[in-house]
Amino acid sequence: MGPVMLDVVGYELDNEEKEILQHPLVGGLILFTRNFYDVEQLRELVRQIRKASRHRLVIAVDQEGGRVQRFREGFTCLPAAQSFAGLSDNLNGTQLAEEAGWLMASEMIAMDIDISFAPVLDLGHQCAAIGERSFHEDPEQAKMMAEHFIKGMHSAGMKSTGKHFPGHGAVNADSHKETPCDDRPLEVICHHDMSIFRDFIQRNLLDAIMPAHVIYPQVDKHPASGSSYWLKSVLRQQLGFNGVIFSDDLSMEGAAMMGSYVERGQTALNAGCDMILICNNRDGAVSALDNLPLTKVEKLSELYHRGGQYSLNELKNSERWQQANKALTALYEQWQDCAR
């Protein structure tokens, strides 16, 4: 399949989108809140996508929990990653983190969605783009919670995506709006932020990784998402990562310094990304499809969900879902009360 992941505009496919999904460069599609009205509509949209595409696409969503959860009505409202470490004991926190990973993945698989881009492995809560999406500022605490979240995802049949390599948590700027710079030296980044990625790669916990649209000027002049140093020299060679590398959305301002959409896509692919995301700009996406060279990335098929076939109603009738839903809803409400 091709190396480009796109989006669609609304609740159902239009004729142009059906044509675009036939393009040999298209290998994936990401869904947003604007694509969701209710469970039945979402199920029909996914069915349309499967029918319209040339081959099976990787269908993705950001269903992390907390403020980043694209589908809410009819699904469990998932607590933010930060909330798990705030519980009175680590055992309860890790158990709930695992159930959150399992429940999130199970609900998405019930809709025939392959992956949620999760978990966030960035450290700390100061960054505007990260905040409560981070499990903890301490690497060991973050590892403990994230490991159990991934364990839950895997048990449901969903692959994990760690983001945002080598770490987005130490900058205040939001890469959706500008290109952040992290001025720390390489040894600090490697020892602190990157330690969770290194550990999880060694233990085969990460199936995919998404690099940050962040520049680390003491290391390389390019954002990590377009840096062959970070993706090839560090991630592939030094850390030995063999999974899928996704770019973050190339329409974000953090990627704008890489040039036009074609230039952004080519830069990210040349740097080592296996699949590039081009969202929220149809003209940019079409330009990339028209001008990028035809390539195939066979390893993307490894990201298809392995959860079997069941409906959302069948899932909700299971005892595990009911218990997990009750506990996670209570934590979600508790966290919302604390945030007010």
UniProtKB/Swiss-Prot annotation:
Keyword Cell cycle tagged: yes
Catalytic activity: Hydrolysis of terminal non-reducing N-acetyl-D-hexosamine residues in N-acetyl-beta-D-hexosaminides
KW rRNA processing (keyword) present: no
GO MF term set: beta-N-acetylhexosaminidase activity
EC number assigned by the record: 3.2.1.52
A Pfam family that the UniProt record links to this protein: Glyco_hydro_3
UniProt-annotated catalytic positions: H176 (proton donor/acceptor), D248 (nucleophile)
Family: Belongs to the glycosyl hydrolase 3 family. NagZ subfamily.
UniProt protein name: Beta-hexosaminidase
Native species: Photorhabdus laumondii subsp. laumondii (strain DSM 15139 / CIP 105565 / TT01) (Photorhabdus luminescens subsp. laumondii)
